Amino acid sequence: AVRTAEELFSLLGAEATILCDAPDGTNINRECGSTHVEHLASLMAEGKYDLAVAFDGDADRCLAVDEKGHVVNGDQMIAIFARQMKAEGRLPGDAAVVTVMSSFGFFRFAREQGIHAETTKVGDRYVLENMRKNGYNIGGEQSGHIIFREYMPTGDGELSAIQLMRVMKKTGEPLSVLAGRMPITPQVLLNVAADRDMKEALHESPEMEALIEECEERLGDTGRILIRASGTEPLIRVMVEGEDAALIRELAERLAAGCEKLLK
């Protein structure tokens, strides 16, 4: 992206300011890119730009920041794309593919828009597998991996940025309005260290099952709980979403403590 982004945006007629474009072989993702959008958020809050986009080291991910300085994550971007593609007749099955870690707010948005949210395990390979199997055109992850199967079978951050600019141009709406259609539900994600054997033991524990049921009852139908083993790291991931930020923090900490107690 360092070598192509400036030329790409220039060809499209965009006035672009390129930041963090001096790689030295060791500074990839260092306080920049899609994992560090804080600087972009503060810059956008000054009101000089219409949007900002941030790529990761290999530019297969893209996150955005709207004109007010609010971060727009992958779920929100997929929501924007799916809604526009449906309006244009480019959304086979009126469906978008996301993962189990996608925001509760995305699923609410999809129901309201008449879009079927197809769910897979975490990982863009599972998203693509589902898209290929069912003939769907859009899918991705909250992290900013987004696949436009009409164009290519993998995530491409620059393509995501172009598509976002296209929707803004076509609708005449600022990014804050486009992204604001998807409700943001508070989310707490905690990690618990665990090896493979411990991961399996967790799913067989009646104590954890009882604790999860208790927490789900307190949460009601305004949120959800997801406890899963990481596919890439020796971790158990505890995710709780809901409208009450204090409650979901309390429940997430209780569930994480329950995991730690069981795994000792």
Task: Label each region the model flagged.
Residues 1-171, 178, 184:
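Phosphate-binding chemistry for phosphorylated carbohydrates and sugar-nucleotides
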Residues 171-264:
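Catalytic-core signal marking the mid-to-C-terminal active-site face
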